[in-house]
C-alpha cells in the first residue's frame, strides 16, 4: 500500500486488524495529483520518492518495503552517485526502523532488458541496489513472489531470484520477525 500522511488514522486502524503493513510506494503525491512511478521519472521525482518512502518507514506502520528500488524501474542501466546516495538513504531508513527490504520476483518476471554495457539485467530486482544492500549486515531481506497468478507461487523465476540473492551473499529471512 502507498503511504500518504493524511491517512495516518487509517493505517493505525488497519494495524488493529492485521499483523503488519507492506509499503509499496507506486505513486508520488504532487500538489494536486498523483504521479505513477512506473512512468518516466526525473531525478527530482526520484528524490521525492526517496523522501516519501523514508517518511513512511519512520512512522513505524510498515514491516516490509516492497521493491525498494522501484525508482530506477525505467532506467535499469543508469547507476551513478545520486542513485547510490538515494539507495543508501532508503536502506539505512529500513534498518533504523526494523523494516524488511523485499526482493520482488514480479519485477524479474517482466523479463530481461539489455544494459548500456550490453549485459542482460532485470529492471528490478536491480543488481546495483542489491549489491549495496549486501554491504549492510543489519539489513533484513525477504523474497516475495508477488503472485499475480497462482502459477507464480513458486515458479522458475522465483528460483532465479533466490539464486541472485545467493550470489550476492544476501541473508534472506525465512520468516518475518515481530
Q: What is the predicted function of each stretch?
A:
Residues 72-73, 78-178:
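Charged catalytic cores and adjacent phosphate/nucleic-acid-binding surfaces used
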Residues 1-97, 102:
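Extended substrate/RNA-proximal surfaces in nucleic-acid metabolism proteins
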Amino acid at each position: 500500500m502507498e503511504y500518504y500522511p493524511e491517512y495516518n488514522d487509517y493505517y493505525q486502524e488497519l494495524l488493529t486488524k492485521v499483523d503488519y503493513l507492506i509499503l509499496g510506494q507506486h505513486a508520488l503525491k504532487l500538489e494536486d495529483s498523483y504521479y505513477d512511478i512506473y512512468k518516466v521519472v526525473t531525478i527530482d521525482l526520484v528524490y521525492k520518492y526517496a523522501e516519501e518512502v523514508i517518511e513512511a518507514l519512520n512512522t513505524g506502520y510498515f514491516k516490509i518495503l516492497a521493491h525498494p528500488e522501484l525508482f530506477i524501474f525505467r532506467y535499469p542501466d543508469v547507476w551513478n552517485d545520486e542513485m547510490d546516495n538515494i539507495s543508501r538513504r532508503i536502506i539505512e531508513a529500513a534498518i533504523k526502523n526494523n523494516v524488511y527490504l523485499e526482493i520482488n520476483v514480479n519485477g524479474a518476471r517482466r523479463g530481461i532488458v539489455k544494459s548500456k554495457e550490453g549485459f542482460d539485467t532485470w529492471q528490478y530486482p536491480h543488481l546495483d541496489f542489491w549489491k549495496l544492500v549486501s554491504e549492510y549486515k543489519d539489513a533484513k531481506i525477504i523474497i516475495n513472489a508477488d503472485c499475480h497468478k497462482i502459477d507464480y507461487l513458486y515458479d522458475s523465476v522465483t528460483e532465479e531470484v533466490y539464486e541472485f540473492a545467493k550470489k550476492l551473499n544476501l541473508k534472506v529471512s525465512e520468516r518475518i520477525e515481530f
